[in-house]
Amino acid sequence: MTLTVRVIAPDKTIWDKEAQEVILPSTTGQLGILGGHAPLLTALDTGVMRVRAENDWIAIALMGGFAEIEADEVSILVNGAERGDNIDTEKARLAYEEAEKRLQTSESSDNLQEKIKAKQTLKRARARLQAAGGMVN
């Protein structure tokens, strides 16, 4: 049984195709979706979404949002998203390393906003690098 999967960001549609399976980074953990799933509305965390379409897995970096799931349809509204095959792995790796350094620097600061922003930047950089295929813990 297939699903119609749509990933929509404010500036463009990232994905609008049929798929056999979807794995989403919800705020409570990974969520696997197959055809015939019970209706669900869930918040999404920054992370990597995986879509199995035509027996290939496609990775998409999501920057938080919401997913509405029906029996055969998954609609995903996100703050930002990028397909892994459109991400330059080396640039993503450099951005991740820079974000790690920024977080380490912010840890010695008393500025709470700076710490939060550094953690968010690292989380986004990690999602992009993972979606591009550059493994990160």
From Swiss-Prot:
Topology within the bilayer: Peripheral membrane protein
Compartments in which it is found: Cellular thylakoid membrane
Gene3D superfamilies recorded: F0F1 ATP synthase delta/epsilon subunit, N-terminal, Helix hairpin bin
UniProt key word Thylakoid: yes
Annotated CDD domains: F1-ATPase_delta (cd12152)
GO molecular function: ATP binding; proton-transporting ATP synthase activity, rotational mechanism
Alphabetic keyword roster: ATP synthesis, CF(1), Hydrogen ion transport, Ion transport, Membrane, Thylakoid, Transport
Cellular component terms (Gene Ontology): plasma membrane-derived thylakoid membrane; proton-transporting ATP synthase complex
S-S pairs: none
One Pfam family hit: ATP-synt_DE
UniProt key word Thylakoid: yes
Domain of life of the native organism: Bacteria
Similarity section: Belongs to the ATPase epsilon chain family.
Assembly description: F-type ATPases have 2 components, CF(1) - the catalytic core - and CF(0) - the membrane proton channel. CF(1) has five subunits: alpha(3), beta(3), gamma(1), delta(1), epsilon(1). CF(0) has three main subunits: a, b and c.
Function of the molecule: Produces ATP from ADP in the presence of a proton gradient across the membrane.
Protein name: ATP synthase epsilon chain
Native source organism of the sequence: Trichodesmium erythraeum (strain IMS101)
